[in-house]
Structure formats: C-alpha cells, structure tokens
C-alpha cells in the first residue's frame, strides 16, 4: 500500500513539475513572392502551350 501511494505521489509531482509538451499545428500558408502578377488569360495560354508541345513525353505530363 505504501508502495502504490508513493508511486501515485511521484506521478502527481512529476506531472506538476514537468511541463506538458505542446503540439503546434502547421497551417498551410502560401506567401506571395512579390514577382509579376500573371492574369488568368496569360496563365491559361501558358498552361495550354505547355501541354500542346509536340516534344512532351509522359514523364513531363505526370510531373
């Protein structure tokens, strides 16, 4: 009985003295690089030009 009481007391003291580990969440955030802003039409034309190339292979498409 003394052994279990001293074990319980040790656990209580350990929890009160050792701070609990805090887990911080990683929040996905995309930051602008300050570069030139591309319009939707420019992006679409660049995207279509990439996939309409004659020398494109399966690896580049999967990337």
Swiss-Prot record:
GO cellular component: mitochondrial inner membrane; respiratory chain complex IV
GO biological process: mitochondrial electron transport, cytochrome c to oxygen
Domain of life of the organism encoding this protein: Eukaryota
Membrane topology: Peripheral membrane protein
Pfam families with a match to the protein in the record: COX5A
Subcellular location field: Mitochondrion inner membrane
Pathway this chain belongs to: Energy metabolism; oxidative phosphorylation
Coiled coil stretches, renumbered: none
Membrane in keyword set: yes
Signal peptide residues on this chain, from the entry's feature table: none
Annotated InterPro entries: Cyt_c_oxidase_su5A/6 (IPR003204), Cyt_c_oxidase_su5A/6_sf (IPR036545)
Chief place where the protein resides: mitochondrion
Keyword entries, A-Z: Heme, Iron, Membrane, Metal-binding, Mitochondrion, Mitochondrion inner membrane, Transit peptide
GO molecular function: metal ion binding
Role, per record: Component of the cytochrome c oxidase, the last enzyme in the mitochondrial electron transport chain which drives oxidative phosphorylation. The respiratory chain contains 3 multisubunit complexes succinate dehydrogenase (complex II, CII), ubiquinol-cytochrome c oxidoreductase (cytochrome b-c1 complex, complex III, CIII) and cytochrome c oxidase (complex IV, CIV), that cooperate to transfer electrons derived from NADH and succinate to molecular oxygen, creating an electrochemical gradient over the inner membrane that drives transmembrane transport and the ATP synthase.
Protein family (similarity comment): Belongs to the cytochrome c oxidase subunit 5A family.
Subunit annotation: Component of the cytochrome c oxidase (complex IV, CIV), a multisubunit enzyme composed of a catalytic core of 3 subunits and several supernumerary subunits. The complex exists as a monomer or a dimer and forms supercomplexes (SCs) in the inner mitochondrial membrane with ubiquinol-cytochrome c oxidoreductase (cytochrome b-c1 complex, complex III, CIII).
Protein name: Cytochrome c oxidase subunit 5A, mitochondrial
Species this protein is from: Manduca sexta (Tobacco hawkmoth)
